[in-house]
Amino acid sequence: MSEKSKVYFADFRCFPMRENLPQRLARLIMTAGFGSIDMDNKYVAIKMHFGEPGNQAYLRPNWARVVADLVKDQGGKPFLTDCNTLYMGGRKNALDHIESAYQNGFNPYNTGCHILIADGLKGSDDVEVPVSGGEYVKTAKIGRAVMDADVFVSLTHFKGHEQAGMGGTLKNIGMGCGSRAGKMEMHSSGKPVVKREKCVGCRACAIICAHGAPQFDEEGKADIDINQCAGCGRCLTICPKDAIAARNDAAPAILNKKMAEYSKAVVNGRPCFHISLVIDVSPHCDCHSENDVPLVPNVGMFASFDPVALDQACADAVVAQPALPGSMLFDEACACNKGDHFKRSHPNSDWNVCLEHAEKLGLGRRAYKLVRI
């Protein structure tokens, strides 16, 4: 794998009367080879994060419009998509998720296409996809609408992440396309836990479980027998009180490897293209209902057929920047304020693990050639 993958780059500089930023992104995407993909009469999934309500760092819907319009220009049928979240918030079921997306501007009038929440109303509509060579994941649970698409395009807001280190293309694909059960598998050992204070003893979990894992004490409260649990996550999606949750016991390195393995399940065997914007590089995920000062100045737009090379190029670009004054990393006593900003932000994480594992799985190369337009 000595050959370098091409990653195309454009900065955010605009000159009067030439092109605006959406036009610049369109030119970048087409220069990178987007037009070579056969999209005629094909369903094209555009995977992105709509942002938790209250967060202001997520990608604006204008960016999604650029991609959707290019897909339609090539005869494709685009839709924006994401999967539901594990945690309480505005995106844990499809209705709330779409409402949150609308609040943040992602409606058909702004984006030129509709939204499909890939894992359905309650996050239980998934497809089990084999992962060849997976160290931790043998069968990934991917949102059905993602797998039903003929072409897959990722549109990523490149940023930090408290567990993975950074939230790039592989996180957008791997974690983002996992159903609620899939996210539980990535975040934990794959076995759920019951929050006793929320359990009302309705036994919905026992009814849906095919393995007899839910057990009930003298108060009627549920508990999960991990020796019987198969880790399917169905109880998590069926509980009406959100009393069942993931254990969140996966070490950061394991989480990163699982994300790479889930990414392989998504992209394997069909045309894919990846876009990443290094803008408003917040230290935390857009899943937060708030966002801190960006870690570094805005860098630009990147695009590639190779998601591994794309993440590496974006990471290198961020690391090369000085810390932004006012950010959590800026130290007035330090003249350089450089280094691995993601590692500095989240010392217990290591984003390199995800890229190393993805390369090992054959998802792409870390070696890249940057092509500026």
Regions found by a protein language model. Name each.
Residues 2-63, 73-82, 87-373:
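Extended, low-polarity segments enriched in aliphatic/aromatic residues
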